[in-house]
Amino acid sequence: ALRAAERPIQPPRESNAMDSTTGRRLIQSDVKFEIDISEHETNKGGMVISGGPVLDSILEDLEDELLSSDMGHEASSELIDSLRAHLIGSRVGRGAPLDEVVERALKGAILSLLRSGYWDFDKTIRDLVSSDSPVVIMMVGVNGTGKTTTSAKIAKRLDDQGFDVVLAAADTFRAGAIDQLAAHADRLGVRCIKSQRGGDSAAVARDAIESARAKGDEVVIIDTSGRMQNKANLMEELQKVHRVTKPHLVIFVADALAGNDAVNQAIEFQRRLSFDGAALCKLDTDARGGAALSISHATGRPIVLIGTGQGYDDLEPFNPNWLVDQLIS
């Protein structure tokens, strides 16, 4: 654990601070996203971009690339339409290749969307721990997305940073889920609070928080039951866990391979529960990550973490520049 003297003193509220869905402070990332296309722009002379078959062909090729990267049709169409409207009438140097100008503008537009509301996971946790320990992280999502494994990865990441972490096995609908999280906890050397199958999920989560507070642990990660977003009774049970625990952060876990299904899930979870950021899993597969852009577009919430493998260390802060390179090769 971080001793009190080692914890950062809470700084005055910064201009790059935001609030979570439960009113806690999120620290925006200082990653720079802007892509400079000024080398092609000019105030006089040059060439004015006009609509027509050449521009249409370039934009169609780029839209096909976005769609093949698992980006949803609605998000890609809106992005391309906005780009077309922005480009027409712009003045560029006569020697500027139009396809290069358009591609750079598209990358800038994508980065602009991804940086909207983007916050730094590690900095936010450190800031929250310094002022309101134990910090409670609630993990939500449907079955099969990698939620339990991601919970364990986050526990490992924070344990490596010196925090005492408690895992809460609040997925009480499946005995296998309880055993799985407990096994992760044993391997990681962290505590796991659990009950028998069929227990009260909210009670397990509450017990974990009270135990952490009593023992001076700094972070509680609640692994909730996988909920299909169209099952009202299950979503209501999840809302109960949220009401009882009042988490500092809610992380929605999405499967990069799920494509438009992941987007629909995110929309419904955002409507019923409201999450602060998403963790996109299974990016070690042949998924190119377009679902990340669609989720951000549809919910207004950022991707903050990505899973890149099955190992505990295969969890990284989301880098929007990396995604742009995946989408537009």
Model-found features: residue ranges?
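P-loop/Walker A NTP-binding module and the surrounding RecA-like catalytic core of P-loop NTPases
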Residues: 74, 107-111, 117, 121-329
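Non-catalytic terminal/linker segments enriched in charged/polar, low-complexity residues
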Residues: 1-125, 132-133
